[in-house]
Amino acid sequence: MKLSIITINYNNLSGLRKTVESVFAQTCRDFEYIIIDGASTDGSKEYLDSIKVNNVADKANTDNKLQITNYKLQIISEPDTGIYNAMNKGIRVSHGDYLLMLNSGDYLVDSNVIARIIPELDGTDIIQGNTICTRNGKTFVNRGYGKSDINYIDVQKGYFLHQASFCKRTLFEQYGYFDESYKIAGDTVFYIRCLGKGNATFKYVNQTIAYYEGGGVSDGKNAYWIKQRALEQKRLSKEEFSIRQWNTCIEYDKKGRLYDKLHRHKWAWSIMMLMSKIINRMEK
């Protein structure tokens, strides 16, 4: 099977409906659909129970009903310990060569998204398209990196769009599953490890895949999530972007602009190396 689409949900019935209906509306059905619900109490579980045996309403269908009997569908509703625990559950039961994480509230832009993207799933480890986002009342297309030739320095910027990223399932076997000790940055850590430090390949395709609803934990603006984001950024800096790894970063970025600039100015390179040694000693 070429593709598995994984949706996680917790108490977001309205968002879940949008996501599910956008998936069931696809003209191409060469995928399995996995929904992981965290034992919701807002009616999500009952809604998921209903679509196991019934039709689901869909505005794009002329008779306002969409048959779901031909879909390979898995639904799990049970308590979990967080976003990345739920995502990992979905990954472990998936069978597709590629995985798309389309969480509740995010939805595919039209009924031909999967038909258009399937030919692009060519063996590249991670294939990323665009999302449509709305922030501060403005709607725009987010192209992430907007290029295929990314390097370690690019990876540090964290422009990954999981709603538009098709990852080979074998990457999780090779580099590990999402780190469940993170509440916000677990997917960022995964991409750093397989693209920044590992040898995974990446391709950008200029196709818009999904609407990103926003308002998730990574966008959280209350005091708790602001503090959590700061803590995880500090942890990332220490564990993934430590100055001790700077020489390795440069090695991974040999084709990047920073490497070229430093080597054109030998004094800048010498200063950078000296500062690296000093900071390494301070950190010990």
What feature does the model see in each segment?
Residues 1-4, 24-35, 43, 72-74:
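Short loop->beta transition adjacent to catalytic acidic/histidine clusters or analogous donor-positioning motifs
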Residues 99:
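Short aromatic/hydrophobic "clamp" motif used to bind/position activated sugar donors
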Residues 189-190, 196-284:
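C-terminal subregions of glycosyltransferases and related glycan-biosynthesis enzymes
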Residues 144-229:
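Conserved nucleotide-sugar donor-binding catalytic segment
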Residues 22, 29, 37-47, 103, ...:
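A conserved acidic beta->alpha catalytic loop
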Residues 107, 111-141:
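Conserved donor NDP-sugar-binding/catalytic core segment of glycosyltransferases
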Residues 19, 76-94:
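Glycine-rich, basic loop-to-helix element that forms the pyrophosphate-binding segment
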Residues 1-25:
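N-proximal low-complexity "stem/linker" segments adjacent to membrane-targeting elements
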